[in-house]
Amino acid sequence: SVNKATAKLYPVANTPQAILALGVEGVKSYIKTIGLFNSKAENVIKTCRILLEQHGGEVPEDREALEALPGVGRKTANVVLNTAFGWPTIAVDTHIFRVCNRTHFAPGKNVEQVEEKLLKVVPAEFKVDCHHWLILHGRYTCIARKPRCGSCIIEDLCEFKEKVYS
């Protein structure tokens, strides 16, 4: 849903200045299909101000600076560092967490543990793309309820005890 919202927003406003010109209500009108859109719109406006005032209108290539932005945590910082700057980061979301624990590829009790294990086991040449593959696998095959184990290409490697074949 984020991609759909930004596909409508960016042709109209794709710079911090242009987004600020829309204001909170204007941003809301473009992102209302996203959960928590009210607080996210406010954070987007605050972030645009900070980008202009502290970073010359550019997104910083620095984890600490990214995580200091309103609404930006480790996962979002990892996504930005990976997709915008090509860093070998792995942003662990609910899909990746589920896939890694079900398959025992990189099990962990929390996203930080899963991320740490993934960074150790994923070969360097795959780190930039790995999180995209795992997200898609979790979103479309290894879904939360009734996973599609019968059509899973790694089913033979998976250690999930409650496999579903239908």
Residue positions per predicted region:
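Catalytic cores of DNA base-excision repair glycosylases
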Residues: S1-S166
